[in-house]
Amino acid sequence: MADPSTYRPAPGTIPDAPGVYRFHDAEGRVIYVGKAKSLRSRLSSYFADLSGLHPRTRQMVTTATGVRWTVVGTEVEALQLEYSWIKEYDPRFNVRYRDDKSYPVLAVTLHEDFPRLYVTRGPRRKGVRYFGPYAHAWAIRETLDMLLRVFPARTCSAGVFKRHSQIGRPCLLGYIGKCSAPCVGRVDADEHRRIVEDFCDFFAGRTDTLIRKLDREMRQASEELEFERAARLRDDLEALRRAMEKQAVVLGDGTDADVIAFADDELAAAVQVFHIRGGRVRGQRGWVIDKVEETGTAALAERFLTQFYGEQAALAEQADAGGTPVPREVLVPELPPECEAITEWLSGLRGGRVAVRVPQRGDKRALMETVERNAKEAFTQYKLRRAGDLTARSAALQELQDALGLDTAPLRIECIDVSHVQGTDVVASLVVFEDGVPRKSEYRRFAVREGAEGGDVGSIAEVVRRRFARYLKETAPPQEGGNGSAGATAAVENGSTDTVAANGSVGTAAGNGSAHTAAGNGLADTAAGEPEADVAVTPQEAERTGIDPETGRPRKFAYPPNLLVIDGGAPQANAAADALTELGITDVAVIGIAKRLEEVWLPDEAEPVILPRTSEALYLLQRVRDAAHDFAIRYHRQKRSKRMKSSTLDSIPGLGEARRTALLKHFGSLRRLRQATVEEISAVPGFGQRTAETVHAALAAGGGTGESRDNAEGESQ
């Protein structure tokens, strides 16, 4: 661990101005990002007596080897820059909001000709509008089933929709009145979209207008003696009212608001959010965070508002499906310290005025108390789980260190597994665990090349060589003149200019004199008064430390593991160790874990290490091995499926994936496409006469088969 005094900024070098600061470790990774009204006051607090610091803060400052800062003009700029850097660098010591679970949402595919309604937990997609999240999937599915009577929109997948279009008969929902059956032309695209838009209006909280409209139509139908239509509208009204009863009115004035509450102790905190739209609870979410420093409720509120609404705005922009991520009102237990800056920033995201308030009395105060009770309950459950989890992970790492005779606990573990079927479509996976927790953003996969001929042993050796050759390449020191050694990439620049972004403001690194240009409008980016070898990262230092000098971010293979786990026995472990020896790497421990008996093999050892069946170390190794196994199998299946689906179309020049998809979608199958004439092919959008003739000739020459091809992908990064 580093002594904070070795990189403490020299007296007088830290400006007394608002700004954003970032601590980095010996490899140049940013490990913490923070902002302050006064950089001098805030940074000085980190270099006080270590015994008086929060445990996580103490761990952070002793892990760091340097600190840099950026001066900004306003607190809003500091807020924006802090959020951007946290999102970019993903610092390990910053507050991380982790969902207690993946909450279900209701999705509406507005980008399709016939929009579909469905419940999902998956990633957000462009052109899809989302409602929720909801606490229980069964509840939203029950509500959706009830509302399909009123809004008979499509809920089937693209495959089911296409199949029923071809056979000319609707599915069961079409027969029982819960789908308008656009697949067989009962309604056209415009009419179906109106149904979907009414559904979206209802879920967005505009219920009164819809109910008045249906009530008016029901009375009109009754007056015109259309009793069947009036009865159907009456049933629709009843279904709507039943659905609304499931969402109790909590704020009688039709308020749109998010109600946020916290429960915390000195090490962690839980946050709960109730999303109120039109006075009704439309969604609920919960997170748990690890505190880095002694943080009160007001500071927690500020950080949560910044991260949560920043991410929601990014998702809304990505989905491009309308709606605003920020409500008119945000209710919090305590106002953030920089409430005006937060309010201004939120108003910018919304495109209209946003009020951040603390409810004092009435319904809003009662609702806040309800959310606080939920937060306390969630926090209690989290602490019960976390107590066992932290203890188990710490014990597992210590047991591994002792059993394998390692110098330090293996804080970073990598595992390699190979997957194939009888030597075909040979692929490998590499998974990463840090502090006993999967680091999925650093998972990698490999398409095995020449090593496949040597079976699992040859494949393992190839993957190890490729992974660690990249590590050596990305961390090799540069030669004179800016050229890296041992196959390293050439240095990006000569001299000592570190360009973070462009705007012409320059700040001087203490004790070095190298210039730095920071992001934003006139932001001065300054490195702390550190020793000569640990000042701002120049392009040459970046090459040595594995930091990309253009982006300032770690390269993909820049950090070696403390322990390399191979899914296999002694032969596989020996192959991995030999590959490392060839590369001159001697500081990475290698083991193999054999299936069935769960034996741990060390290279060149005649007997395995037997870990107790109930040990936390064995359980951790099994988790790592299983994660690599699952990741490899998924890639193998994907690669095999791609090869099996390859056809004559793949070899036609000028025919890309989009055009191939358009052809198959238009004709339904390759067989029907072969039977098509040139004129029929040219009728497909995007196909001219010449392209149609090329396709027709290629299919005629290819006959009825068309050999499959294996498209090797190399490393997927």
From Swiss-Prot:
All residue ranges annotated as the GIY-YIG domain in the record: 16-95
Comp. bias (Basic and acidic residues): 541-553, 707-717
Protein name per the record: UvrABC system protein C
PANTHER family: UVRABC SYSTEM PROTEIN C, UVRC/OXIDOREDUCTASE
Record region (Disordered): 517-555, 696-717
Recorded GO MF terms: DNA binding; excinuclease ABC activity
Compartment list: Cytoplasm
GO cellular component, as recorded: cytoplasm; excinuclease repair complex
Organism expressing this protein natively: Saccharopolyspora erythraea (strain ATCC 11635 / DSM 40517 / JCM 4748 / NBRC 13426 / NCIMB 8594 / NRRL 2338)
SUPFAM superfamilies, per the entry: C-terminal UvrC-binding domain of UvrB, GIY-YIG endonuclease, RuvA domain 2-like
Protein family (similarity comment): Belongs to the UvrC family.
GO annotation, biological process: nucleotide-excision repair; SOS response
InterPro entries in the cross-refs: GIY-YIG_endonuc, GIY-YIG_endonuc_sf, GIY-YIG_UvrC_Cho, Hlx-hairpin-Hlx_DNA-bd_motif, RuvA_2-like, UVR_dom, UVR_dom_sf, UvrABC_protein_C
